Amino acid sequence: MAYSYTEKKRIRKDFSKLPDVMDVPYLLAIQLDSYREFLQAGATKEQFRDIGLHAAFKSVFPIISYSGNAALEYVGYRLGEPAFDVKECVLRGVTFAVPLRVKVRLIIFDRESSNKAIKDIKEQEVYMGEIPLMTENGTFIINGTERVIVSQLHRSPGVFFDHDRGKTHSSGKLLYSARIIPYRGSWLDFEFDPKDCVFVRIDRRRKLPASVLLRALGYSTEEILNAFYATNVFHIKGETLNLELVPQRLRGEVASIDIKDGSGKVIVEQGRRITARHINQLEKAGVSQLEVPFDYLIGRTIAKAIVHPATGEIIAECNTELTLDLLAKVAKAQVVRIETLYTNDIDCGPFISDTLKIDNTSNQLEALVEIYRMMRPGEPPTKEAAETLFGNLFFSAERYDLSAVGRMKFNRRIGRTEIEGPGVLSKEDIIDVLKTLVDIRNGKGIVDDIDHLGNRRVRCVGEMAENQFRVGLVRVERAVKERLSMAESEGLMPQDLINAKPVAAAIKEFFGSSQLSQFMGQNNPLSEITHKRRVSALGPGGLTRERAGFEVRDVHPTHYGRVCPIETPEGPNIGLINSLATYARTNKYGFLESPYRVVKDSLVTDEIVFLSAIEEADHVIAQASATLNEKGQLVDELVAVRHLNEFTVKAPEDVTLMDVSPKQVVSVAASLIPFLEHDDANRALMGSNMQRQAVPTLRADKPLVGTGMERNVARDSGVCVVARRGGVIDSVDASRVVVRVADDEVETGEAGVDIYNLTKYTRSNQNTCINQRPLVSKGDVVARGDILADGPSTDMGELALGQNMRVAFMPWNGFNFEDSICLSERVVQEDRFTTIHIQELTCVARDTKLGPEEITADIPNVGEAALNKLDEAGIVYVGAEVQAGDILVGKVTPKGETQLTPEEKLLRAIFGEKASDVKDTSLRVPTGTKGTVIDVQVFTRDGVERDSRALSIEKMQLDQIRKDLNEEFRIVEGATFERLRAALVGAKAEGGPALKKGTEITDDYLDGLERGQWFKLRMADDALNEQLEKAQAYISDRRQLLDDKFEDKKRKLQQGDDLAPGVLKIVKVYLAIKRRIQPGDKMAGRHGNKGVVSVIMPVEDMPHDANGTPVDIVLNPLGVPSRMNVGQILETHLGLAAKGLGEKINRMLEEQRKVAELRKFLHEIYNEIGGREENLDELGDNEILALAKNLRGGVPMATPVFDGAKEREIKAMLKLADLPESGQMRLFDGRTGNQFERPTTVGYMYMLKLNHLVDDKMHARSTGSYSLVTQQPLGGKAQFGGQRFGEMEVWALEAYGAAYTLQEMLTVKSDDVNGRTKMYKNIVDGDHRMEAGMPESFNVLIKEIRSLGIDIELETE
């Protein structure tokens, strides 16, 4: 394989044995693809597919007026251009969105004509609000903050059969039910009651007998019975009664008479149970009629009404039970044929028949009225109202939609072959569902498993946005219908009919405040990527935390390869919020699919198929680690497989599919944990969750022991700068990289230059620092997809969340008791865990009713020293180091007791008497914060004069833009002239500046000309003249284009900012705060091994080895056995080997060994100890040297999950590094120099500093605000709260009998308002007496009692 620009600089030793059949897919595809389909941005009218916005419009339009004389049709839509780019939106606090313009057609029909002739057509584009755009990293910028829309896992529409698990009735009887769930519309439930009658519920209202619904559909009793039951036919001939025999139906019954064949031979004796053997004999004997006694009919149910043969009078209605009296009537009327329902207790129960018996309705109208009463209790029913209501419930496309998914699931579940059909229900659908339900109750068929991923589907961003959009459009539709009737009379245009506000409001509400629109976690690249790959069962139309039971949260066999069984939050959301597995994707119906390799006759092919949970059930699927021979055949006698959602073993020839990779089971975060297979699941869960909380350190350090997924995560997260096109690095500095694009990648009309402006010290959503550093040098050749610059937590294009620390597992004076961590001072000195946090502080100047607030350096009653960091505009300088309480932005607010008269205002304006009536409301640095000002932004409302600071910031920004554009032009111009030079040199000229006719043009001549004079050359060859003209035109076009671009940016910068009403000016100050690691900070490894730093020890006191190398961290060995996360120990051993090899390479470099020796040693490391072979021969000597230099700090290793390094390979690595194979060494106590009594495990572990810093949690208060009601201090750091002398503290003082102290505590020191102020006054006056009054809490108590309706008063005697 060819190495990319960054890979060849540092190759990871890979221990995996299994081949890569399939690359890890693009990790953000689920977000980007979904939203791309929703917008269909570049599509023309013909290319529009019936999805997303287009589908939403088509479902609501055409809108027809109530009279039917006017209609509004939808033609198409187009999206405009965004006003600002992503960075500008974040800065200005606006939404990154594009205007949506919809072309609609208003058609007015001629009232007079009979056949709806068209009288008038008007077509117009209508603005329908703004649609947020997704950034290229799968996020949305809403009001300046970066948000993510999390996908939702919800119950798929369709039909589901279930039972109550015996919980409803005390007998424990299983009550079966069926539920038809549409995508939108009313739910329809059928359920059995303990007496085995079937009931129906609509939208979970009160239940009605199911037959009411069937009657409402127009079925008669007889049709209902025919649909559900077979019939037994009896013939009456005089005194004999003959049954038309269907032998199969007799099975399991007890013979009430002897059953004989034609010859009179007894086949079944009376009283015997009829078995399958008897039935075979009856069929062989060809018995078709069976004479039965008349009492055989008693208790049977009539299937067809019995009619008097002579008079036509109905003797018995269908579905009545035959009694002796009825039989007598039948015999008297000489009826010759009776049909009864065939039912039995085993597999054909009389459920529908029983239901009809408890049904009070007798015809369709009564049934409709009954349903109307249930849906709209208290309203008088009319025939029309009842019919309309019922028709709209399930049979109107506007109110009810199963959706394509629902129809497919519905048809599959009830056993139909076609998977397409209408979105509304039909009579047959309802009958089929009831039949299936009755079959299940009869013991044929099984209930569904609701937690099966074939019954839950994923709703992605696009689909949710489309639903919201449709909601908005339906609101618009109501308004448009009202106005359409006016349209014809008043000659209105489409624009006058459509008010886009409801659409815009629906979209805004969804992106701004939906439960699934979340503030993006931006601690580090991994937390971004996992947030976008989240799948939540919560949210609108989903579950709620309180109602979700254990089953929904549990791991299901179908999660395999679709949803990660490890990564889920701890706490109330466990199992409800999941992460997508590495290779999972959604299919067109929204079901999660996983990839598999096809296996034919035990030969594994390279063909890959993606299957959903339903499709995979019938397959026999081998694991990715199954042993194959050279030909790719399965060789084991029995292979571990999955079949029918069970784990079992099968012969190789039965296997039909095979997993693609061992890591397809887990999510991205879990696949970053090396030796995951040796960790307990609970700890792995904590490990994958804590990696997301790691704070990017000052200098990222790649993990010595990784899994090989680090590069994918860094590349796909979007924090690195990736080359869009290949080329040569033209120039590079800390803030930008300029690439001159290779000629073969430049398309005509494009600029042959790519400029990448790097993000420098920007604040993330979590206040961590986003900073990019270039990796390339001038003149380097890069290819498309190479990494040009590292972002936060990335090191040479690999994810690097923490630091490699030398750890020892040993107790150390109790400092590592209970998971505490003992750190060496060296870690702090080397800034290993120093992080930068950026805080944004905002100062807003508003227009108050006493006059405008002003931002100024002229602040009353503030000394000169406090103002020395402000400029003349009253805003702090960039670069100033500030402490808590320093002024950042000076601001004064008018404080007038009285409102001024116009005359006074004028006098004030003339004489400028300010100080007397303004108060200081400056923005100050909050308590407990000190840092450096790194940026200031000033936003001014239109029409308000901009201050000097705003102008200087604007000038700086313009200079930067101009510099970029000039650079671009310089390269384009340079490339054009180079091409011209190649064509001109050596060609003959007709004339030109200081040139005779027929002279050959030389390099020297061209160098002597200014570039503008080149175009004055007249060549002998006309083609060259044409080329010169084209070049001249191209260059002037380019210049014009860039000038226009500059003017456009300038216009945007100079126009006023769109601020909230009443706001005149906003100043944002960004502070960078450097945080070193200190006791109280939380740290963790990748295996769920977390702890708090307890002490930072001097280097000389730390345990050290025989060479005098001290360890960085001492961890408690007792944290390992009970937690069962042994992966950390293996990581420590392999880390030691990696570091040891790096030191060995370093010694070779210092001794200036030959390149051949280096190459040989590298070959030993990479290719002789297990795992994947690396092709070092394709690297030249210089590249080998560069590689060796980068490996000095340690040779990075990759042990992929479930396919990692074996114990023997770790030992071999340790041996190669000349280290003890046990991974243990003798340590010495740094304080005494004595050797510890036994060898200690020492090695390198990757440690993270988590975003739970003691600085953010520690807080102190002397005086501060009080709660309004109780007059006690507020609680918590955010409210600047204090401590409360609470109930238990009062008990303590009571126990001591310290009455005076207690009185003081409960009154003047706490919430006796008058007492406190009096006390303060007394202390100032030097009078140390105390007068205790009434504590506010007592008043609260009295108010509480009064609120219960008890009159209580405190009377003073």
Swiss-Prot record:
InterPro entries: DNA-dir_RNA_pol_bsu_ext_1_sf, DNA-dir_RNA_pol_bsu_external_1, DNA-dir_RNA_pol_su2, DNA-dir_RNAP_su2_dom, DNA-dir_RNAP_su2_hyb_sf, RNA_pol_bsu_bac, RNA_pol_bsu_CS, RNA_pol_bsu_protrusion. GO terms for molecular function: DNA binding; DNA-directed RNA polymerase activity; ribonucleoside binding. GO terms for biological process: DNA-templated transcription. CDD domains: RNA_pol_B_RPB2. DNA-dependent RNA polymerase catalyzes the transcription of DNA into RNA using the four ribonucleoside triphosphates as substrates. The RNAP catalytic core consists of 2 alpha, 1 beta, 1 beta' and 1 omega subunit. When a sigma factor is associated with the core the holoenzyme is formed, which can initiate transcription. This is DNA-directed RNA polymerase subunit beta. It comes from Pseudomonas aeruginosa (strain UCBPP-PA14). The lineage of its organism: Bacteria, Pseudomonadati, Pseudomonadota, Gammaproteobacteria, Pseudomonadales.
